[in-house]
C-alpha cells in the first residue's frame, strides 16, 4: 500500500554517517610496469592520503598499502595540490603533507627524505615530478615560501641523492607539467602569469637538455593570454602532443616543428580546467594510437584516436565520468564514475576491451529505487548557442 506523506518528511536510507564511514576517496592513478597505483584518502585514518598498489596477481578489491602510518601523501603547491607522487621501477617518490618535503620509498623500505628542512617549515613545496634517469634526478615544480610576499614558483631538479633543488626555469608566476622526451634530450612545460588562471591563458615551452643537465634554447611553442594549453605529453616515437582550446574547445594537437596540428577537431572537451597538478585525459598505446577521454554533450566518453587515419572510435562503457587515465603495455587504467554505483578504479584490457573494477570508493549498497538516473538535456541559450545540463527526474 502506498502511503502519502508531506515533502521532506520521508526517511531516507542514505545518511551522511553511512556514506562517510564506509567511503574513501580515490585519485591519482599511476602505472609502473604491470603494477597499478593510486591514492586513497581515508576518513577513518584522520583524512590522510596514502598510495596503494595493485599487482597483476592480486584479486580485484585486494590492494597493498604502500605509504606507512604517519605519512600523508599531499602537496600544497598552488594550494590546490595534485601531482603529489610518482612511481619509477618500484620506488615511490612523494610529497609529505606535514613538512612538504620530498621522500623516496623503495620497495620494502621506510621512506627516506630527499629535500632539506627549511625555515619556515613547509617553506619549499614540490609537485608534478618526473624522473630524469640520465641525470639521476627528479624534475618538478617548486614553490618557494621562504620570503615574505607572494610565493615564487619555478621548475627545478632534485638529485636522487638528496640536496637543495636546482632551479632550471623561473621568471613567470606559475609553472606546471614538466615533461621529458623519451630520450631525455628535451623538456616541455606549461607556464602562465597573473591575472590569468590556467583555463584562461597559458604557454607551452620547450628546451634542450644538455649533458650537464642544464637547459638550452628555451622557446615558446604555442599559447597566449587567451589560449589555454595543457597536458603536454610525448608519444613513444618522441613527438610532443598537447591539448589546446584555441578553437574554444580543448582538443588534441601534435607539434609539427613549426605549428600545432589538430588531430581530430570536434566540439568536445578533451580536458577540463587544470585546478590541480597531474591531470591526465590521454595516453599512448605502443603503436602510437591515443587512448583518450572526452566530454561530448555533457557526458564523459572513452575513445581511441588513430593519428594516421584521423579517426576517433568510442569505446562503450557503463560510466558517465572517466578520469586520471593511464596507458601501459596492453592495459589502461582510470577512475570511473557511474550514475548507480560508487566511483571506482577500473582496468581496461586493450586487446579485448574487457573492464575490471579493481577498487570501489564505498561499500554502501543503495537500492536502485532510490536513485534518479540523470538525463542529459540541451536547450537554446543566448548568442545562438546550445547549453547542456543534467536533469534528475523525480522518482517519488
Segments the model singles out, each with a brief description of its role:
Residues 31-33, 87-89, 132-134, 182-183, ...:
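Residue-level detector of Asp-centered blade-edge/turn motifs that repeat once per structural unit
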Residues 36, 92, 138, 187, ...:
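Hydrophobic beta-strand positions that form the internal "hydrophobic ladder"
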Residues 7-54, 74-86:
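Beta-strand-rich domains and repeat architectures in extracellular enzymes and scaffolds
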Residues 40-50, 73-79, 94-102, 118-125, ...:
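A flexible loop/linker signature enriched in serine peptidases of the S9 family
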Residues 23-30, 39-40, 49, 64-65, ...:
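Non-catalytic accessory segments flanking enzyme active sites
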Residues 91-107, 111-114, 128-131, 138:
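Hydrophobic or amphipathic alpha-helical targeting/insertion segments
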Residues 55-59, 106-109, 159-163, 209-213, ...:
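Short loop/turn segments that connect beta-strands within beta-propeller blades
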Residues 13-19, 64-75, 112-119, 164-169, ...:
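A short beta-strand motif characteristic of beta-propeller blades
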Amino acid at each position: 500500500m502506498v502511503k502519502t506523506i508531506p515533502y521532506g518528511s520521508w526517511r531516507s536510507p542514505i545518511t551522511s554517517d553511512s556514506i562517510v564511514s564506509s567511503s574513501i576517496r580515490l585519485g591519482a592513478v599511476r602505472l609502473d610496469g604491470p603494477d597499478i597505483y593510486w591514492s586513497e584518502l581515508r576518513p577513518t585514518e584522520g583524512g590522510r592520503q596514502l598510495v596503494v598498489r595493485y599487482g597483476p596477481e592480486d584479486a580485484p578489491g585486494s590492494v597493498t598499502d604502500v605509504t606507512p602510518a604517519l605519512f600523508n601523501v599531499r602537496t600544497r603547491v598552488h594550494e590546490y595540490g595534485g601531482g603529489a607522487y610518482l612511481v619509477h621501477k618500484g620506488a615511490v617518490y612523494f610529497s609529505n603533507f606535514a613538512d612538504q618535503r620530498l621522500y623516496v620509498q623503495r620497495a620494502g623500505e621506510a621512506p627516506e627524505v630527499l629535500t632539506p628542512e627549511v625555515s619556515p617549515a613547509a617553506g619549499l613545496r614540490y609537485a608534478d615530478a618526473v624522473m630524469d634517469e640520465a641525470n639521476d634526478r627528479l624534475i618538478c615544480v617548486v614553490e618557494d615560501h621562504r620570503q615574505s610576499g607572494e610565493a615564487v614558483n619555478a621548475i627545478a631538479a632534485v638529485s636522487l641523492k638528496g640536496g637543495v633543488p636546482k632551479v632550471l626555469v623561473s621568471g613567470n608566476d606559475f609553472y606546471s607539467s614538466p615533461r621529458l622526451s623519451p630520450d631525455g634530450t628535451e623538456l616541455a612545460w606549461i607556464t602562465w602569469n597573473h591575472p590569468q588562471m590556467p583555463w584562461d591563458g597559458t604557454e607551452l615551452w620547450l628546451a634542450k637538455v644538455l649533458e650537464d643537465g642544464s637547459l638550452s634554447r628555451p622557446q615558446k611553442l604555442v599559447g597566449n593570454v587567451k589560449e589555454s594549453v595543457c597536458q603536454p605529453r610525448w608519444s613513444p616515437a618522441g613527438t610532443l602532443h598537447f591539448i589546446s582550446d584555441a578553437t574554444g574547445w580543448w582538443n588534441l594537437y601534435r607539434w609539427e616543428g613549426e605549428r600545432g596540428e589538430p588531430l581530430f577537431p570536434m566540439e568536445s572537451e578533451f580536458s577540463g580546467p587544470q585546478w590541480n597538478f597531474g591531470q591526465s585525459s590521454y595516453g599512448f598505446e605502443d603503436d602510437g594510437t591515443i587512448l583518450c577521454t572526452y566530454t561530448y554533450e555533457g557526458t564523459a566518453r572513452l575513445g581511441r584516436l588513430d593519428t594516421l587515419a584521423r579517426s576517433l572510435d568510442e569505446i562503450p562503457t557503463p560510466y558517465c565520468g572517466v578520469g586520471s587515465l593511464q596507458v601501459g603495455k596492453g592495459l589502461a587504467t582510470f577512475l570511473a564514475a557511474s550514475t548507480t554505483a560508487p566511483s571506482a578504479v577500473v582496468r581496461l584490457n586493450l586487446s579485448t576491451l574487457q573492464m575490471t573494477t579493481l577498487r570501489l570508493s564505498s561499500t554502501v549498497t543503495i537500492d536502485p529505487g532510490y536513485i534518479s538516473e540523470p538525463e542529459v538535456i540541451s536547450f537554446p541559450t543566448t548568442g545562438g548557442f546550445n547549453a547542456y545540463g543534467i536533469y534528475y527526474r523525480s522518482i517519488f
